[in-house]
Amino acid sequence: MSKQNNRIIPTNRDKKICRKCGYHVCSDHYVANLNKHHEIIKNHNDKINRVNMNDIINIKLLFHILLPRDSFNKDKVISRTHDIVCSLNDDFNNYSSNTNTMNNSKYKNIIKQIFGANTIKQGIYLSSDYQKIIPEKSSNIVFELGEIYYYPVKHKLNLSKYDDISDVESQRHEIEQYVRSSEAGAYEPKKFVNIWIIDMIDTSILGFSNFPWEVVNSCHGIIANRRCFFPEEYGESNYSSFKTFTHHMGHHLGLLHVYNPNHCQSKSCDSSGGSKSIVLDFIIDPLDKINNKKLHIDKEYNPYFTNFMDFTCDKYVSNFTVRQIQEMRFMINKFKPKLNSLLNESQCPIPKYNPETDTISATINFNQRFSNREGSAVPSYEKADNPRMSASQGMINPEIFMGIADPQQPFLKPTVVPTNKNINDLIPNLCGTTLPTRKSGNTQDQIIENIQNVLPSSYMNSEQPKDAYADFKKKYNIIYSEDSYIINHPHNPYLLQQHHQDISAMQQQILEEKNQLRRATIDVPVCGNPYNAGQTVGHYVPPINPEEIDRFNAKRQFAESFNPEMFRPNDPLMYQSPQVDPSCCQKPMDPRLYRPAVPSDPRMGQYMTDPRLFQNGNQTQYQSNPQSNPQFNHQAYSQPNPQAYPQSNPQMYPQQTTFPPRYDPRMNNPYASRATSNGLSPNNVVQQYQSYYDNPSNQQSNQQSNQQSNQQPNQQPNQQPNQQPNQQPNQQSVQQCNQVNQEALNDLRSRNIKASPTVSPGDLINKMNRVNEQLQNIKSSLQQDPDTSTTTRVNTAVGQRSFGVPRVSNDQSKPKFNKFGQPITNSPFVSGNVASTAMSGKITKENISVNPRDASKAPKSRFQRTKPPQAV
């Protein structure tokens, strides 16, 4: 643990030397970009030498602060970002033809300070060979502070488990994952330069950066350590002038580290005991004559250590070279043309997180969606004039406030349309290049000639090299040979992407060759009208896509394996097996698989047999051939053909079992005779005869439907044709069923009763039965005792029926319990009083017998208490 400037910095190991950049010659990522850089320079060397150096390129910087909330001050962060912007502008633009001013003068002072009395070394570094590579004018690349964004980070990034040299790629991936987890992704990396300030511990690397030709992702930009952003907190003196940001900005704009013949031995790898140790040889402090003895003694060793792209500490670097400035401007124009905010308007979103209040604020209105800073010039450390001062920042348009103050005034401006414009000026530029000189005149020939001059050339006229495929294949074999770089570095991201592109290009080339061979074997139609007599036209077949062939083969295989028997609605193949035993096919199918032909009798169960089907030999009509029934002619009800599956094994499938007939359980009910005596069924009889009663004209159609229902096939396939079914004790005959139906029909029509759909059939039947018995008791009492008053006899008869016999309900079998969990039995007592009929002794066999002596044992109300028995 160490304490610097009242800030505790935890550390697990000693870091001897800090390094500006994580890239070095042993990094796979850097070597891949090194090859890409050399390829770009080789292909565009002429364009780089002729690049325009006078146009101003204005670049906006976005700072993403990923620091713990209590470890920094917001005002200090704003001040430090302005210092970094000033340092970048000075390093890129403070150059002059006068060698005694600006960075030119700074270079001389550094050489004199390092070598002192060593005039030989001073003469080498101050010679014309070194002086001519220093720029004599500004690069005209200006930097501007766009916006600062804060993120609620709770912890620092610990990189103690990685080595700073051998695990540099793993460190980079860990940092990118930390940025993504903090939801601090890059904002429009093609229009802005995103810079992340991260609090890293246990690492000596000060930053990473992306090259302009790399794939743009959420971490595309510059990643800087807090050590180079707040160097005073760490007591850092070697990297306190913010030249680390200049170094990484050069990487981000396409520059590499400075290499010359003196740096060819800058990498040394010593292998011992199966482990590899990497030692990097670079100059950090040129005044250190012990570690840099060769620099002060050897006349042939003269590295260019004052360049910003070297690893030298901040106080000994001073300039770029002319070639480096040309490369940076070319990379911006080629890979990031939208980075210039002067040509492409770009607005930065306002920050939402406030680190002082630890809150996230949303957008207030449309005017505050983007940041609009004051248009003041960027300050500089130098007093000399600089072209960057001409770059102005965006300001709020005053017309917006005028429109808000006066909403009736529209924001429309009259557009000036020139009149009598020459028609040749309206011809669009379709070729995308400099337009040729157009001829004046409005004649038809001149207009057509001007239009033809601006038409783009056809791409079919461009000649392709004949041996392009051979060169590509030769290059591919060289790159992917056993001694190539990609074999030794398989995890190179750039080469891995290039490998996939090469493979896809080769596959496309092979496919095109196959299509050409196919077209060569097919007669191509000749020019002219193919319908003319005597003209032969060959049949042209276009090339077939391999994906279409695969889809066609898949459809053909599915069609061959498709079995239509599997998709029948009631086919047993859907639930038994793909094949059916032929022995089972000879028998009729299970009747449960058929759709019922007529509605079953409501007094019977689901699988109960209607006795009317056995009358007059109706079951023999379709017993021998059930398929003869016209109702089963549909394909869904047809029997499977046994010859369709000749290879099936009969032992594989069990025999179909025959289910015995099930009878209505209500027939065993002692109250079933009373319930059905009046012709009412507890199921759907009321609803069945309700429709009949509403339309009495349906009586004739009902009789015809009853006659047709007697002709339906039997539901028991194993029953013999001439054999009558066994008569069960509770099973009714056909005459009884018809008689019950007729009685119920007559009873409903005589009473003028319509069943309510909300009343259950069981309750309606019980109520009607009680009413019938009450009427019968009243009639019998009037005949037996004519002297008694009518009111007394009616009350007696009604009370006898109401209180003497318990009511019949559908839930007799369900036990009932009181609130104490005790079972409740049917009792003749009502509210603690014995029924009048029970007390008088007029209880018949139809009613429940009650002993009058038990009246004293009647249960009292639960609100009354009885005294406990006293001991004798």
From Swiss-Prot:
Residues 496-524 form a coiled coil. Residues 687-736 have a biased composition (Low complexity). GO terms for molecular function: metallopeptidase activity. The keyword Mitochondrion does not apply. Residues 615-659, 670-686 have a biased composition (Polar residues). Pfam families: Peptidase_M43. One of its GO terms (cellular component) is virion component. Residues 595-736, 844-872 are annotated as: Disordered. Keywords: Coiled coil, Virion. This is Uncharacterized protein R722.
